[in-house]
From Swiss-Prot:
One of its GO terms (molecular function) is orotate phosphoribosyltransferase activity. Its EC number is 2.4.2.10. This is Orotate phosphoribosyltransferase. Catalyzes the transfer of a ribosyl phosphate group from 5-phosphoribose 1-diphosphate to orotate, leading to the formation of orotidine monophosphate (OMP). NCBIfam families: pyrE. Pathway: Pyrimidine metabolism; UMP biosynthesis via de novo pathway; UMP from orotate: step 1/2. Pfam families: Pribosyltran. It catalyses: orotidine 5'-phosphate + diphosphate = orotate + 5-phospho-alpha-D-ribose 1-diphosphate. PANTHER family: OROTATE PHOSPHORIBOSYLTRANSFERASE (PTHR19278), URIDINE 5'-MONOPHOSPHATE SYNTHASE (PTHR19278:SF9).
């Protein structure tokens, strides 16, 4: 029952009559963030021996698509990630490299709409289509737009950097890169070295029941 109540509180709005836009009720942001951590622990955290997409070995694996595609958790992700990036100015669209970024971008888009903010979402393909419009980036055109690149989790920073470069090649300006979970294995340093502002909603040490990540 507590989770249902928490979800309802996420969407509690106060209306500003001057703008006719909803403003986010931020009083319980810490509660919402902790709720997201609980969902990740319950649904997405596995311990064992794993090979990550970066090729690195890990004693744990966080399958964030089990959370980002869950109908209960997606609204929470939308709020947490929106609060992370909402102060960035003049952002038009949010997206990243398929497929980890896709549900994150859509969750932010839907939550933002519920509070009067307009963000389009877009999908960066790993390879350009060879049929139809042969697009590398799907969704509303981002040429000339200011965008935020998102990712569910990042180990080395390579995926969001790739998405950012492709968005720039299309004619977009990248305002920042934002990830839901930073594995604390060098992604921040790589992304900032590449010239992008970096935001992370959670660190892996927020999720693991130990002081440091393996």
């Amino acid at each position: 029952m507590q989770r249902i109540l928490d979800l309802r509180r996420i969407y509690a709005l106060t209306v500003d009559p001057r703008t006719l836009h909803g403003s986010v009720w931020k009083v319980d942001f810490k509660v919402v963030r902790q709720e997201l951590i609980r969902y990740i622990k319950d649904l997405a955290l596995f311990e064992g021996e794993f090979i990550l997409s970066s090729g690195q070995k890990s004693s744990y694996y966080i399958d964030l698509r089990r959370v980002s595609l869950d109908c209960r958790a997606a609204p929470i992700i939308g709020k947490v990630m929106f609060d992370l990036i909402c102060d960035l100015q003049d952002v038009d669209a949010i997206g990243g490299l398929t497929m980890g970024a896709d549900p994150i971008a859509c969750a932010i888009m839907h939550y933002a709409a519920s509070v009067g903010r307009s963000y389009n979402a877009f999908v960066v393909r790993k390879q350009k289509k060879t049929h139809g419009l042969a697009r590398l980036i799907e969704g509303p055109d981002i040429r000339g737009k200011r965008v935020v690149i998102v990712e569910d989790t990042s180990t080395t920073g390579n995926s969001p950097i790739t998405a950012a470069r492709r968005a720039e090649e299309t004619g977009a300006t990248v305002a920042a890169i934002a990830v839901m979970v930073d594995r604390e294995t060098g992604a921040r340093q790589a992304i900032e070295k590449a010239g992008y502002s970096y935001y992370a909603a959670l660190r892996v040490t927020d999720i693991l029941d130990r002081g440091t990540a393996d």
